[in-house]
């Protein structure tokens, strides 16, 4: 039996174990998935003991999607371009990093039949998830992509020079956007009572996507729904990226895993 899992901080809320273990059982895959709640100073030991603990692969979530890069021997496109990794395959002599969030986000839009070509898009946040969503929207030919961040100067170091980056306090013309994506943990399980931004005036039929999936409908999504938006949480993205990760961990891939 091989071990797989999720590393992050304060992540006991994650639905990943249920998704993965159900899939393993259904497809007779000899894997088990568990949570690894790690502090920053525990990552070194976790990496050193991967083979000892029979770990075949692992996912990475907040706040370590960029931190993990220093431990990898190879980073596969588009993770290398994004500069963030959420899936690691453990081979005999090396660790390989991937970004299956990228795939999961694109597949979730396809699931809801949302075509973002020519959309004006707003990304809330500037961390690893935000970079992933930015490159996915570029791949899908979104017309215009703007980033809002609490620290725009720091954010500018992470994105292409041509990207428009604003202080989140200064962006109040939300009716210009066709798609708004929250890539922060604000509104998620550890910050349920907060919203990353006020949605007082948004375009009718605007798509508001919150990558958080717990609670199912965050305060941001509730407000968006009240204002006529089509709302999406991160559950489908989580599922699609999980299947992609499983495919990478299995030697020859598995049915439905890619």
UniProtKB/Swiss-Prot annotation:
Positions with a binding annotation for shikimate: 14-16, 61, 86, 101, 213
Record-linked Pfam families: Shikimate_DH, Shikimate_dh_N
UniProt: NADP(+) binding residues: 125-129, 211, 234
Pathway membership: Metabolic intermediate biosynthesis; chorismate biosynthesis; chorismate from D-erythrose 4-phosphate and phosphoenolpyruvate: step 4/7
EC class (word): oxidoreductase
Molecular function terms from GO: NADP binding; shikimate 3-dehydrogenase (NADP+) activity
Keyword Phosphoprotein: no
Keywords: Amino-acid biosynthesis, Aromatic amino acid biosynthesis, NADP, Oxidoreductase
This protein's record includes keyword NADP: yes
InterPro entries documented for this protein: Aminoacid_DH-like_N_sf (IPR046346), NAD(P)-bd_dom_sf (IPR036291), Shikimate_DH (IPR011342), Shikimate_DH-bd_N (IPR013708), Shikimate_DH_fam (IPR022893), Shikm_DH/Glu-tRNA_Rdtase (IPR006151)
GO cellular component: cytosol
Annotated EC: 1.1.1.25
GO biological process: amino acid biosynthetic process; aromatic amino acid family biosynthetic process; chorismate biosynthetic process; shikimate metabolic process
Organism superkingdom: Bacteria
Catalytic activity of the protein: shikimate + NADP(+) = 3-dehydroshikimate + NADPH + H(+)
Active-site residue list: 65
Family indicated by similarity: Belongs to the shikimate dehydrogenase family.
Subunit composition and interactions: Homodimer.
Protein role: Involved in the biosynthesis of the chorismate, which leads to the biosynthesis of aromatic amino acids. Catalyzes the reversible NADPH linked reduction of 3-dehydroshikimate (DHSA) to yield shikimate (SA).
Protein name in the entry: Shikimate dehydrogenase (NADP(+))
Organism: Clostridium botulinum (strain Hall / ATCC 3502 / NCTC 13319 / Type A)
